[in-house]
């Protein structure tokens, strides 16, 4: 299935049902008076966040959505049936914009969360409502209002705890395949990954986190070079970024220091807020070096980058060091959640009067 993370759709709410002109007609009652009922309200259109979707590909072939119209009123003061609301399921992490103005309408980040994108038309009014002391037989009614119609843009930002960052062939897809049930395409050439992959990483029997792998970045990615720029937005919601470096023996075209600097520059150029997301350094393909050189290699890279954060040496292909990495990630995510809960529960300071 093709991965789609941005789409434009048209939504139209239902029209309100018309009110009607009607008079009571019964045997032996010559002047029964008005009994025209109101129409029903038009159905509204809502977007609803679903955890069963991870792409907007369902919207490739269906771009127009319309809620049901309200029914007209009836005699005997019967109100018309309201149109049924339309709920459109979208993936978690979908942002909704007015296509014409780029105004943000909402951000769907919780399962079951809904967003009204087109309100149904108001019901029409029957002639009973116009009866008064001076107008006992009104022959006027009001039509139902039109429902809202608008063109909206849906933009998906995947919700993942951990995002994988790095140059093409740094081993990101190999890592996510090693630690989760995700099955990305893996091959020994650049840009094997053509779209983001999500995997659930289980740590122990009860704990897990979600990992996201996007296509590798190259110099100029923020300006549209390569493939990764199309999917950089999916890293914006991650709580931890793992920056993978290929540490296999250097060639003329491969240098982990240069690779790190290029990817870091493109990341910040795309969005400076990425600097606020914790980033861990992951030195991959260390099994291509003799074991006695691992520590030396790690120290050389850390010193060259003046790296102050966390660093791990692994081999994603061989599964060396990956369990320790995932355990550390789970511990960090648990601590983050605990800190956030404590901040939310902290009482506000009393106001001084």
Swiss-Prot record:
Residues 1-159 form the Obg domain. Mg(2+) binds at residues 173, 193. Its EC number is 3.6.5.-. One of its GO terms (molecular function) is GTP binding. One of its GO terms (biological process) is ribosome biogenesis. GTP binds at residues 166-173, 191-195, 213-216, 284-287, 315-317. Monomer. An essential GTPase which binds GTP, GDP and possibly (p)ppGpp with moderate affinity, with high nucleotide exchange rates and a fairly low GTP hydrolysis rate. Plays a role in control of the cell cycle, stress response, ribosome biogenesis and in those bacteria that undergo differentiation, in morphogenesis control. Belongs to the TRAFAC class OBG-HflX-like GTPase superfamily. OBG GTPase family. This is GTPase Obg. The lineage of its organism: Bacteria, Pseudomonadati, Pseudomonadota, Gammaproteobacteria, Cardiobacteriales. The gene is obg.
């Amino acid at each position: 299935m093709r991965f789609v993370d941005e789409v434009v759709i048209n939504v139209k709410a239902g029209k309100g049902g018309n009110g009607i002109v009607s008079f009571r007609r019964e045997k032996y009652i010559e002047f029964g008076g008005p009994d025209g009922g109101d129409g029903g309200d038009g159905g509204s259109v809502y977007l609803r966040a679903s955890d069963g979707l991870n792409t907007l590909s369902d919207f490739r072939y269906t771009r127009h959505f319309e809620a049901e119209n309200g029914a007209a009123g009836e005699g005997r003061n019967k109100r018309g049936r309201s149109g049924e609301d339309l709920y459109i399921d979208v993936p978690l992490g979908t942002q909704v914009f007015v296509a014409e103005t780029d105004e943000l309408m909402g951000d769907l980040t919780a399962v079951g969360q809904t967003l009204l994108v087109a309100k149904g038309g108001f019901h029409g009014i029957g002639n009973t409502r116009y009866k008064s002391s001076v107008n006992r037989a009104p022959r006027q009614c009001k039509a139902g209002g039109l429902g809202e119609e608008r063109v909206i843009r849906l933009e998906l930002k995947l919700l993942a705890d951990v995002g994988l960052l790095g140059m093409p062939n740094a081993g990101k897809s190999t890592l996510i395949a090693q630690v989760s049930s995700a099955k990305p395409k893996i091959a020994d050439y650049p840009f094997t990954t053509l779209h983001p992959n999500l995997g659930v990483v289980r740590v122990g029997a009860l704990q897990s986190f979600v990992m996201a792998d996007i296509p590798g970045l190259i110099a100029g990615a923020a300006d549209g070079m390569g493939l990764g720029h199309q999917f950089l937005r999916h890293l914006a919601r991650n709580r931890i970024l793992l920056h993978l470096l290929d540490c296999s023996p250097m060639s003329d075209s491969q240098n982990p220091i240069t690779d790190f600097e290029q990817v870091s520059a493109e990341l910040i150029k795309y969005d400076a807020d990425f600097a606020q997301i914790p980033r861990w350094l992951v030195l991959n393909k260390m099994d291509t070096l003799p074991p006695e050189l691992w520590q030396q290699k790690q120290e050389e890279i850390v010193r060259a980058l003046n790296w102050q954060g966390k660093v791990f040496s692994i081999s994603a292909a061989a599964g060396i060091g990956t369990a320790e990495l995932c355990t550390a990630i789970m511990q960090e995510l648990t601590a983050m959640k605990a800190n956030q809960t404590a901040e939310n529960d902290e009482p506000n300071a009393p106001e001084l009067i």
